[in-house]
Amino acid sequence: MAENQYYGTGRRKSSAARVFIKPGSGKIVINQRSLEQYFGRETARMVVRQPLELVDMVEKLDLYITVKGGGISGQAGAIRHGITRALMEYDESLRSELRKAGFVTRDARQVERKKVGLRKARRRPQFSKR
């Protein structure tokens, strides 16, 4: 591994992201594409940038990210979690600030499974009295 490179793994729903951080000019590369190319939705881009904006390091670090599985919001959440972990490896003093914003905790919510006899996880078929 190259020196002064920091790593963090992030997970959310069924997505997993590997994030590598090194000092640079603020370039973000996700699966060999830029942030703007990879995420069409502005909300997803905002979620990815949140931890960097919180600690004022948007222009100071280069990010190389690989992400697999899930959909757009799951991948954005996984990347945010990975960036947070990599930032804590980079500078441990950022931990309290990131924890206060709620980025350190892994969101453990998963899709509830569909049950037999129901239409979805909890949606029951319509009830008819007669």
From Swiss-Prot:
InterPro entries per UniProt: Ribosomal_Su5_D2-typ_SF, Ribosomal_uS9, Ribosomal_uS9_bac/plastid, Ribosomal_uS9_CS, Ribsml_uS5_D2-typ_fold_subgr
Pfam families to which the protein is assigned, alphabetical: Ribosomal_S9
Any single GO CC term annotated in Swiss-Prot or TrEMBL for this entry: cytosolic small ribosomal subunit
**Where in the sequence does UniProt note compositional bias of the Basic residues kind?**
116-130
A GO MF label? structural constituent of ribosome
Family per UniProt? Belongs to the universal ribosomal protein uS9 family.
Name the UniProt record assigns to this protein: Small ribosomal subunit protein uS9
Q: Which UniProt keywords apply?
A: Ribonucleoprotein, Ribosomal protein
Q: Which organism is it from?
A: Enterobacter sp. (strain 638)
A GO BP term here is: translation
Region annotation Disordered: where it falls in the sequence: 111-130
